[in-house]
Amino acid sequence: GIVECTKFYQRDMDARSLLNLKLGETPFDNINEIINSEKGFSCGSGDSFVNKKIEMDLDLVDMEAYALAKVCKLEGINFKCFKYISDNADANATSDWIENCKKGAKLFQIKMKNL
């Protein structure tokens, strides 16, 4: 189904070996997480496809939500994020994504009508 994400993290920034930072923290950036509500799912964004378990404790991963949430935070714009979980980020991710994409599109149409 469709889930609402309210917590956003950058999952692929890794400066741990250079500085005393956690995975996902960007050096010299004061915004390393965006939490709009404790209710809802956590989402880790990065520029790589995920096909195995990652080190961060996240509900789901994508490639764009953190950037959108951060721009909205910086500009004072309310941000709502709904995601359709298309696959389990495993060896079957590609075939699962293809199979589930049409289902997700239909569910998003229903969700948008009910907002």
Language-model-detected regions and their locations in the chain:
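Glycine-rich phosphate- or other oxyanion-binding loops that anchor nucleotides, phosphorylated ligands
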Residues: 1-115
